[in-house]
């Protein structure tokens, strides 16, 4: 799928901050490299399940981000649908920043294995705040 120009921007901030309600994600970019920031929900993908954002760093590594309340199953479905429609490159990361506590257990471990095996994607889940560095 081609991402419309109106849905993306290029940023070179040291910290690219994404926030919705109580969940926030910081993409650390200390060398101020160009990062393509895509608003997925409501722009790049209009209908069906979709994550909130996609960041593509200067090495073409994709970072799919879902800022979520408590519904982790829905967050996983949103990331899967977005990767299927927009994913092009590997390595790839998928992030869920949730207000749910705790983010442990067999369901979480199984989801991480599923993403690695089926999507060649490293799934990272955090509570309320997540920070990730440019590769």
Show where each model-derived region lies:
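Acidic-basic catalytic patches of nuclease active cores, encompassing PD-(D/E)XK
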Residues: 1-46, 56
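Domain-level recognition of nuclease-like catalytic cores that cleave nucleotide substrates
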Residues: 1-8, 43, 99-135
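Catalytic centers of nucleases
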Residues: 46-56, 72-75
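Conserved catalytic cores of phosphodiester-cleaving nucleases, focusing on short active-site segments
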Residues: 53-55, 61-69
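Flexible, charged surface loops at secondary-structure boundaries
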Residues: 56-59, 87-89
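Generic beta-strand structural signal
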Residues: 63, 92-93, 121
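Nucleic-acid nuclease catalytic cores
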Residues: 72, 86-110
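Histidine-anchored nucleotide/phosphate-binding helix
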Residues: 76-87
């Amino acid at each position: 799928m081609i991402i419309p120009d109106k849905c993306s921007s290029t940023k070179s901030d040291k910290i690219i901050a994404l926030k919705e309600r109580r969940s926030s994600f910081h993409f650390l970019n200390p060398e101020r490299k160009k990062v393509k920031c895509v608003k997925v929900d409501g722009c790049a993908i209009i209908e069906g399940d979709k994550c909130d954002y996609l960041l593509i760093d200067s090495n073409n590594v994709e970072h799919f981000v879902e800022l979520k309340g408590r519904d982790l199953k829905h967050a996983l479905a949103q990331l899967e649908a977005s990767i299927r429609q927009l994913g092009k490159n590997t390595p790839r990361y998928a992030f869920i920043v949730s207000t749910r506590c705790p983010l442990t257990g067999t369901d979480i471990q199984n989801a991480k294995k599923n993403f690695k095996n089926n999507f060649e994607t490293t799934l990272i889940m955090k509570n309320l705040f997540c920070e990730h560095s440019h590769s």
